[in-house]
């Protein structure tokens, strides 16, 4: 049995006049499989959720800290979702909160030293897991897929969602 048939898709994979829908379903299948594996590995090996990893990753990229609004925009989720995750990381000692010097209504979340140390290990494992999952795809093909997905991203940005005449 080939590795392609071991992962079930929502369609048979054949391309016809519904190429766009089938492409979207294949992208969804791949994304879902990768996400499920990451969730399971983070939970099993570190006792942490993927959303906590995502928040820590965003804060690691912004050592100056981020507001809940900035975090929600960066992670493409609601502020309510981010707040719960940040509160859990705060309880665990991985994140600190401080009042914003420019906006009294906002708080700035930052990784603590313990949070940075924890994230370093998480990020190394995350990188290794992704590399292992994509190891069967030659580097040149990964680069080509990345470039093609950039074209898709541009197409998505151009679609306003309004009905076309």
Language-model segments: which ranges?
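Active-site phosphate/pyrophosphate-handling residues
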Residues: 22, 54, 143
């Amino acid at each position: 049995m080939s590795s392609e048939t071991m992962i079930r898709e929502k369609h048979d994979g054949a391309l016809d006049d519904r190429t766009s829908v089938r492409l979207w379903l294949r992208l969804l299948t791949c994304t879902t499989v990768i996400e499920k594996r990451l969730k399971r590995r983070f939970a099993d090996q570190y006792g942490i959720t993927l959303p906590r990893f995502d928040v820590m990753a965003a804060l690691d990229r912004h050592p100056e800290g981020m507001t809940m609004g900035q975090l929600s925009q960066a992670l493409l989720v609601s502020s309510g979702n981010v707040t719960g995750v940040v509160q859990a990381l705060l309880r665990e000692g991985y994140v600190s909160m401080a009042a914003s010097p420019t906006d009294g209504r906002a708080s700035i979340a930052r990784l603590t030293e313990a949070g940075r140390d924890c994230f370093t290990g998480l990020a190394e494992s995350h990188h290794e897991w992704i590399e292992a999952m994509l190891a069967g795809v030659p580097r040149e093909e990964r680069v080509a897929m990345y470039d093609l997905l950039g074209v898709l991203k541009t197409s998505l940005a151009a679609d306003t969602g309004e009905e076309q005449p």
